[in-house]
Amino acid sequence: MNQIALPLDWPADETDADFIVSASNAAAVRHLEHVATWPVWATMLTGPRKSGRSLLARIFVLKSGGTLIDNAEEQNEERIFHAWNAAQESRHPLLIVCDRAPPEWRPRLADLRSRLSATPAIRLGEPDDQLIDRLIERLLGARGIVTRPEFRAYVVTRIERSFIAVQRFVDLVDQAALARRAKIGIPLAKQVLAEMGVIDESRLLV
């Protein structure tokens, strides 16, 4: 989303079950579950693209009744500043989703910089093995493809740990299966990973 959105703008059926929790993102999820412990009524959420950060943010806002600013670096800084102040006055949480938290992100507006310096920042990490496994299962499952545990285990131990790599693998293995009329299994996964050039040799099992 490229604007400050109201909860009514989002699908009403998104739930906690839509966001996969693993060790790589559990700390961020816990933080969002305990708004009462926040030092101010705002938090910044960062993480890689395709990490589910916008989904997690929407679920949080739908549950909490708060406000979301997504892609914050692209938004009007005055609007973010006023949203931050409004959150403190109303005591309704504000979640700011951004690529980088300060000091890497340095707004030009001094008043906003001062507010963000007092705002906690949480981060979704790159996917761990458990999350990669479940992402492959879910993404291919959404296309009507049931995957076996050994297929996913083969991919997990070889693919680069990034959400972009996982999404690209799913797209390519699905396309390859259709083009070659091949079953989605380890032989096809091996071919696709080699073609992608994303095999992480350091993660291969001995």
PLM segments and residue spans:
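Short regulatory helix/loop adjacent to the ATP-binding pocket of P-loop NTPases
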Residues: 102-117
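Conserved C-terminal helix/linker of AAA+ ATPases
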Residues: 177-195
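Walker A/P-loop nucleotide-binding motif
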Residues: 40-56
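Conserved P-loop NTPase "ATPase switch" module shared by AAA+ and STAND
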Residues: 63-79, 83-86, 90-101
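Phosphate-binding P-loop
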Residues: 20, 32-40
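Dynamic helix-loop-helix/coil hinge segments at AAA+ ATPase domain boundaries and subdomain interfaces
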Residues: 4-26
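C-terminal helical "lid" of AAA+/P-loop NTPase domains
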Residues: 153-157, 164-178
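Conserved AAA+ ATPase "SRH/arginine-finger" region at the nucleotide-binding site
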Residues: 119-131
